[in-house]
């Protein structure tokens, strides 16, 4: 049985979020949450929040035993990009792309 949660339109770069997501995939939920708690990164806190939501969904909706859950998938997809300009010298401007992410966490019962 699986349980999942997702957060959409999160203002964090997908590339940076994927670095953190790959660290917790395949680990037990308890170990993954400890890794995320002590990772000094904005995306770690966001993934931790989504993981807590998936854990609550598993406990409340699917009635799963939270001690046996593992992190099956952490999917980070690219959301919309906000485009901004930064004024530069001599009347020029450069593009700034403020990227966003859609983050999904899937927990399942099973062995590590």
Swiss-Prot record:
Function: This protein binds specifically to 23S rRNA; its binding is stimulated by other ribosomal proteins, e.g. L4, L17, and L20. It is important during the early stages of 50S assembly. It makes multiple contacts with different domains of the 23S rRNA in the assembled 50S subunit and ribosome. The globular domain of the protein is located near the polypeptide exit tunnel on the outside of the subunit, while an extended beta-hairpin is found that lines the wall of the exit tunnel in the center of the 70S ribosome.
Single Gene Ontology BP annotation: translation
Subunit structure: Part of the 50S ribosomal subunit.
UniProt xrefs under Pfam families: Ribosomal_L22 (PF00237)
Alphabetically ordered keywords of this record: Ribonucleoprotein, Ribosomal protein, RNA-binding, rRNA-binding
Database matches in CDD domains: Ribosomal_L22
Domain of life where this protein originates: Bacteria
Name of this chain's protein: Large ribosomal subunit protein uL22
Family: Belongs to the universal ribosomal protein uL22 family.
Database matches in InterPro entries: Ribosomal_uL22, Ribosomal_uL22_bac/chlpt-type, Ribosomal_uL22_bac/org-type, Ribosomal_uL22_CS, Ribosomal_uL22_sf
CC per GO annotation: cytosolic large ribosomal subunit
Claim: Acyltransferase is one of the keywords in the record: no
NCBIfam families registered for this protein in UniProt: rplV_bact
GO MF annotation terms: rRNA binding; structural constituent of ribosome
